[in-house]
């Protein structure tokens, strides 16, 4: 029974060995000297202005999580839209309508809780 897992073991072993070898080569061959110019933060080719250690408000993370949820929605809707003709008519529409209604309920909840309001309280 374990013989059937041997190819998987070989592939994982090769991947680990290759990763270690490539990281080691990069460490050996790569540049080792740091200077102040290399240690400055990069801001799109501009000279850094102000401190780079400022705090980011939680609202940015909330917007990022909402974006991920709706991005995943699009990922699920694309295969459904491509194969819609092969689905059995109305019965192919019901699961997607249910899925979209659940997501719209979540979006309504977000708006109701005023999670996207950026006004100071």
Curated annotation (Swiss-Prot):
<dbReference type="InterPro" id="IPR000440">
    <property type="entry name" value="NADH_UbQ/plastoQ_OxRdtase_su3"/>
</dbReference>
<comment type="subunit">
    <text>NDH-1 is composed of 14 different subunits. Subunits NuoA, H, J, K, L, M, N constitute the membrane sector of the complex.</text>
</comment>
<comment type="function">
    <text>NDH-1 shuttles electrons from NADH, via FMN and iron-sulfur (Fe-S) centers, to quinones in the respiratory chain. The immediate electron acceptor for the enzyme in this species is believed to be a menaquinone. Couples the redox reaction to proton translocation (for every two electrons transferred, four hydrogen ions are translocated across the cytoplasmic membrane), and thus conserves the redox energy in a proton gradient.</text>
</comment>
<dbReference type="GO" id="GO:0008137">
    <property type="term" value="F:NADH dehydrogenase (ubiquinone) activity"/>
</dbReference>
<dbReference type="InterPro" id="IPR023043">
    <property type="entry name" value="NAD(P)H_OxRDtase_bac/plastid"/>
</dbReference>
<keyword id="KW-0812">Transmembrane</keyword>
<dbReference type="GO" id="GO:0005886">
    <property type="term" value="C:plasma membrane"/>
</dbReference>
<comment type="similarity">
    <text>Belongs to the complex I subunit 3 family.</text>
</comment>
<keyword id="KW-0813">Transport</keyword>
<keyword id="KW-0520">NAD</keyword>
<keyword id="KW-0472">Membrane</keyword>
<keyword id="KW-1133">Transmembrane helix</keyword>
<dbReference type="GO" id="GO:0048038">
    <property type="term" value="F:quinone binding"/>
</dbReference>
<feature type="transmembrane region" description="Helical">
    <location>
        <begin position="90"/>
        <end position="110"/>
    </location>
</feature>
<dbReference type="GO" id="GO:0030964">
    <property type="term" value="C:NADH dehydrogenase complex"/>
</dbReference>
<protein>
    <recommendedName>
        <fullName>NADH-quinone oxidoreductase subunit A 1</fullName>
        <ecNumber>7.1.1.-</ecNumber>
    </recommendedName>
</protein>
<feature type="transmembrane region" description="Helical">
    <location>
        <begin position="6"/>
        <end position="26"/>
    </location>
</feature>
<dbReference type="GO" id="GO:0050136">
    <property type="term" value="F:NADH:ubiquinone reductase (non-electrogenic) activity"/>
</dbReference>
<keyword id="KW-0874">Quinone</keyword>
<dbReference type="InterPro" id="IPR038430">
    <property type="entry name" value="NDAH_ubi_oxred_su3_sf"/>
</dbReference>
<feature type="transmembrane region" description="Helical">
    <location>
        <begin position="62"/>
        <end position="82"/>
    </location>
</feature>
<dbReference type="Pfam" id="PF00507">
    <property type="entry name" value="Oxidored_q4"/>
</dbReference>
<keyword id="KW-1278">Translocase</keyword>
<keyword id="KW-0997">Cell inner membrane</keyword>
<keyword id="KW-1003">Cell membrane</keyword>
């Amino acid at each position: 029974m374990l013989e059937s897992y041997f190819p998987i073991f070989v592939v994982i072993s090769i991947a680990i060995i290759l990763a270690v070898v490539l990281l080691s080569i990069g460490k050996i061959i790569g540049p080792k000297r740091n200077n102040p110019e290399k240690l400055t933060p990069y801001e799109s080719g501009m000279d850094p202005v102000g401190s780079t250690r400022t705090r980011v408000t939680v609202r940015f993370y909330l917007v990022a999580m909402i974006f991920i949820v709706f991005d995943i929605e699009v990922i699920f809707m694309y295969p459904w839209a491509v194969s819609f003709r092969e689905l059995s008519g109305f019965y192919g529409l019901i699961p997607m309508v249910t899925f979209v209604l659940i997501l719209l309920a979540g979006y309504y909840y977000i708006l109701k809780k005023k999670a996207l309001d950026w006004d100071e309280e």
